[in-house]
Amino acid sequence: MSNDIMGVMARMIILIGGMPTTGKTTLARELSQKLALPWLSTDQTRLVIQGVADPKQYPQLLSAHGLSAAEFFQRFSPEEIAEREYMHGIETWPGNKKLIEDDFTWREGFILEGVNILPSLLPSLQTSSDVRPLFLTDEGDDVLRKAIFSRGLYADADTYADELKEYEITWARLFDQRIQAEAQQYGYPVVRIQKDSEIDIPNVLSSLGLPV
């Protein structure tokens, strides 16, 4: 971010949520360069929590460890997986909340992105920082299908059967619908990503109330 903008703004924290494959990491990286703010992912904070977590306190976060893709999709329906993904956000929220509220390593702020950012949890934040959330969705199932079949969600796409990826399309869309509905309920912007930086970055900046 230019010095003149930073000079008049409070410490700013940008939160980017949404279902998998919407380009949250790519967007966070591009915003980081444009705004001169560091970024990190809830994937990283989740790994830290998993490394020290008690399974009794984090039942959803740890219960599927060691399962192959076939075993995982045999055990859980798409609806159950979407619910599990949502519960991961709830179980990791205390750690992410503390980071947002208490970490002043980055005094000008930072960008935090990931599926673990849930609209329903954000009102619990207590901070003087300028917190600006937004949530991403995509252009539809064709885009989602292409992304999942090319990269995979449970693991690298070439390590498990394509028929299992159909389950991933279903659960990801269910999760997306829930996040969009919650974002609208709490008044947070939802941006439909087109995977074109020249279009997406201005749309995101505008939705965040920042200069384009």
Segments predicted by a language model, with ranges:
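Hydrophobic anchor at the beta1->P-loop junction of P-loop NTPases
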Residues: I16
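Hydrophobic positions on the alpha1 helix immediately C-terminal to the Walker A/P-loop
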Residues: L27
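Short beta-strand-centered segment that lines the nucleotide-binding/catalytic pocket of NTP-utilizing
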Residues: L37-A53
